[in-house]
A protein has these predicted regions:
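Short, polar/charged alpha-helical segment
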Residues: 29-51
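Short helix-initiation/N-cap motifs at beta->coil->alpha
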Residues: 52-63, 150-179
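Ligand-binding clefts/hinges and TM-proximal coupling segments of bilobed small-molecule sensing domains
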Residues: 129-144, 148-154, 234-272
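A bilobed periplasmic-binding-protein/Venus flytrap-type ligand-binding module shared by bacterial periplasmic
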Residues: 102-113, 215-229
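Beta->alpha turn/N-cap motifs
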Residues: 56-58, 68-82, 99, 173-174, ...
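A conserved helix-loop-strand patch within extracytoplasmic ligand-binding domains
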Residues: 95-145, 243
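Ligand-binding "clamshell"
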Residues: 83-95, 108-110, 181-183, 188, ...
Length: 272
């Protein structure tokens, strides 16, 4: 009898230990929705209880992971993560790429690039990494020329050799870029903020050609990169059922898909 009770107690302890509270941080945008619909159900089957934590400023989710207040965050690309690690002395690492909406050039006043007049005002994200992305979109449109040999992830307006369209480039907080559409002719808006504001990627006058360093990631503390919860998150994103769910939802059309997605009826024209 004693052995049975001891065995039952050990089973209860093992069951309790297999379940865990998992705190995941997000900024405004589509990543929480994709996680809740496609990742959380897989994790819950493994015994996890998911707690969603929302942040409003870019450094906050990383600070929370560094301090152990949350386990992981999903909101940033690796270039931003590395810059944060350096400036804030964090030690966070990416564990898996996630489907990511690209930055785009939007306007409430014009329906095509051809309609945009000389001297138009363009708002761009003020942080250096995303300023560079915005300037590359303007260059791809043929509106500005970037000096040769410039660091491609640290461009600024000073690195333009020509601005034949005489654009007025105005830096703004990235999260406020969608609201700047009320005052500016155009706005370069990061995909997550565009989606959070209710814009569709198909509304953009031009989308960036998103390369892998700008595809967003799940980030954790380096000491947790091999932890079971981190491995389970990676497995959930790489699971075929997540890919099927993502590619079957028209809301996510136009996203840059991670390289581990296998070719099917792709949801992203930007997939390599």
């Amino acid at each position: 009898m004693t052995h049975r009770l001891l065995g039952a107690a050990l089973l209860l302890i093992a069951t309790a230990a297999s379940a865990a509270d998992l705190k995941v941080g997000f900024m405004p945008g589509p990543y929480r929705d994709a996680f809740a619909k496609g990742i959380a159900p897989q994790l819950e089957k493994k015994g996890y209880t998911i707690q969603y934590v929302e942040f409003s400023q870019g450094v906050q989710p990383n600070d929370a992971v560094e301090r152990g207040q949350i386990d992981a965050n999903i909101f940033q690309h690796t270039i931003y993560l590395e810059a944060n690690n350096k400036s804030q002395k964090f030690d966070l690492v990416p564990i898996v790429h996630v489907p990511t909406p690209p930055m785009g050039l939007y306007s409430k006043r014009y329906k095509s690039l051809a309609d945009v007049p000389e001297g138009a005002t363009v708002t761009v994200p003020q942080d250096p990494v995303n300023t560079a992305r915005a300037l590359r979109i303007l260059a791809a449109a043929g509106w500005v020329t970037i000096k040769p040999g410039v660091d491609p992830v640290a461009l600024s307006e000073r690195d333009l050799s020509a601005n034949p369209k005489k654009l007025k480039i105005i830096p703004v907080d990235a999260a406020q870029a969608p609201r700047s559409l009320d005052d500016a002719d155009l706005a370069a808006i990061q995909g997550n903020f565009a989606v959070a504001y209710g814009l569709r990627l198909t509304e953009a006058l031009k989308l960036e050609d998103m390369t892998l360093p700008y595809v967003n990631v799940v980030a954790v503390k380096r000491s947790n990169k091999d932890a079971k919860f981190a491995q389970d998150i990676v497995a959930a994103y790489r699971a075929p059922e997540f890919q099927r769910l993502f590619e079957s939802n028209a809301v996510w059309k136009g996203y840059r898909l991670p390289d581990y997605f296998t070719p099917t009826t792709t949801a992203s024209s930007g997939k390599p």
